[in-house]
Amino acid sequence: METVLYIAVFGALGCLSRYYLSGWVYELFGRAFPYGTFAVNIVGAFCIGLIMEFSLRSALVSPQLRIGLTIGFLGGLTTFSTFSYETFRLLEDGELLIASANVLFSVMTCLVFTWLGIIVAKAL
């Protein structure tokens, strides 16, 4: 139950952070490009690398806190952070083909499903 509470609290904070950070970035740079989303994805990718690497090497971060920060906060902030971390680990392990497939399939599948969602929404 403690882990679920960590996820819920940090998830709410991640969602609010995404809202405010992306909004601030959009105010600075406009909406011609998805700068806000791009910014939170970069922040999330950096944070998951930092949190995972630090927490797996140190006893200072409990497993519950690590889960709260990664699944909760970063999950609320962005899902791209997990994608980045997993792809980096594949590359680090010498799995270039799998890492490349992960990038290609993830991006293409998300684009296709975005397109499908738009089609369904337009049909309603």
From Swiss-Prot:
One BP annotation, GO: cellular detoxification of fluoride
Record keywords: Cell inner membrane, Cell membrane, Ion channel, Ion transport, Membrane, Metal-binding, Sodium, Transmembrane, Transmembrane helix, Transport
Membrane-topology descriptor: Multi-pass membrane protein
Alphabetized InterPro entries for the sequence: FluC
GO terms for MF: fluoride channel activity; metal ion binding
Subcellular compartments: Cell inner membrane
Highest rank taxon of the organism: Bacteria
Transmembrane stretches, start-end: 4-24, 32-52, 67-87, 101-121
Binding-site residues for Na(+), renumbered to this chain: 75, 78
Listed GO CC annotations: plasma membrane
Catalytic activity: fluoride(in) = fluoride(out)
Pfam families for this protein: CRCB
Major localization class: membrane
Mechanisms controlling activity: Na(+) is not transported, but it plays an essential structural role and its presence is essential for fluoride channel function.
Its job: Fluoride-specific ion channel. Important for reducing fluoride concentration in the cell, thus reducing its toxicity.
Homology family: Belongs to the fluoride channel Fluc/FEX (TC 1.A.43) family.
The protein, known as: Fluoride-specific ion channel FluC
The species this protein was found in: Geotalea uraniireducens (strain Rf4)
Gene name, Swiss-Prot/TrEMBL: fluC
